[in-house]
Amino acid sequence: MNDNAFITVDRVTFGYDASRTILNDVSLVFPRGKVTAIMGGSGCGKTTLLRLIGGMYRANQGTITFDGRLVDPRDKAGLFALRRRLGMLFQFGALFTDLTVFDNVAFPLREHTNLPEVMIRDVVLMKLNAVGLRGAAQLRISQVSGGMARRIALARAIALDPDLLMYDEPFAGLDPISMGVTANLIRKLNDATGATSLVVSHDVQEGFLIGDSASLLSSQGRVVAHGTPAELQASEHPEVRQFIDGAPDGPVRFHYPSRSLEEDLGLVQ
């Protein structure tokens, strides 16, 4: 047993239906207080893994434990308590467009606590200050840029001082400056709060830069490699090398599994 384990994924298999398995016998341990980059090609199950950890889905097989407690979507009270300790930055922000920046960040505080509004105000301003956007508190979401929206979502994710922060493609669609700012915030917030962070990303450079360790999932939803960034960079595993080097040819095929083109066009008798 790993005493430093905060999240344990034990032989988890999951598919949205019987026709396709997304995650296949996945076992991973995410240590307390560390940043782990979860990488792999599109469709390999990275986001699905975060959703399973957050209790949004239930695994077909295997178990997930959060700080020693089983994650089970059927346990509504337990799930509510788990989400009180969890912050998630979704790929597309998931901000409420009809609310101000301030009210977006205040939302989890109003939902999960009984704090008076005067205290909520102070907490929200501190969180916005941490991401450099205290001055934007009264703006509408329609008035902010994509990079600012990502930082607002981050401020909301840390509003409850969560023990676990999960980031789903936090660098997607950002310019180089915004990407650097976001990566720096993720690393600094983790170090300052002692939280455990899971970062799903296609960006090898940023993932290796901020991650204490990294996990690589294959196109078949299996764990190909797990270790420090240096260990993955030194790996000779064909799928690891193809992903890190961005090579077009390798174990990961360009075409989604299908019948032959000749069969689909009716050319085969």
Q: Locations of the language-model features?
A:
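The feature captures the beta-strand-to-loop junction immediately N-terminal to the Walker
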Residues: 39-41
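Helix-to-loop junction immediately C-terminal to a conserved catalytic motif
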Residues: 54
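Conserved ABC ATPase "signature" region
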Residues: 69-70, 117-136
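ABC ATPase NBD coupling module
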Residues: 71-87, 117, 232-235
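Conserved ABC ATPase signature
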Residues: 140-144, 148
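Conserved catalytic motifs of ABC-family nucleotide-binding domains
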Residues: 161
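Catalytic Walker B motif of ABC-type/P-loop ATPase nucleotide-binding domains
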Residues: 165-168
